[in-house]
Amino acid sequence: MSDRIRILLGRVCNKKMNKSVVVSIERLIKHSTYEKFIKRTTKLHVHDPNNETNVGDLVEVQECRPISKTKSWILTSIIKKSNF
């Protein structure tokens, strides 16, 4: 197991649960045949202990111990608030 802490940036896409949000992480991969860059999206369930985020916020998340069946990430900071 790696000792390095995994930190990712993403956008909040769902906030219908108590103390939990769904964060969408976008990354670029290169197609092996066509050599074109393609966007891929991963959705993570993130623990938000203070319920301080809204949909559309740009956030930083960090991997942690499993909090529930699907939550293994915790919110570390809000980088940019959304307009709505």
Curated annotation (Swiss-Prot):
One of its GO terms (cellular component) is cytosolic small ribosomal subunit. One of its GO terms (molecular function) is structural constituent of ribosome. GO terms for biological process: translation. InterPro entries: NA-bd_OB-fold, Ribosomal_uS17, Ribosomal_uS17_bact/chlr, Ribosomal_uS17_CS. Keywords: Ribonucleoprotein, Ribosomal protein, RNA-binding, rRNA-binding. PANTHER family: 40S RIBOSOMAL PROTEIN S11 FAMILY MEMBER, SMALL RIBOSOMAL SUBUNIT PROTEIN US17M. Part of the 30S ribosomal subunit. Belongs to the universal ribosomal protein uS17 family. One of the primary rRNA binding proteins, it binds specifically to the 5'-end of 16S ribosomal RNA. This is Small ribosomal subunit protein uS17. It comes from Blochmanniella pennsylvanica (strain BPEN).
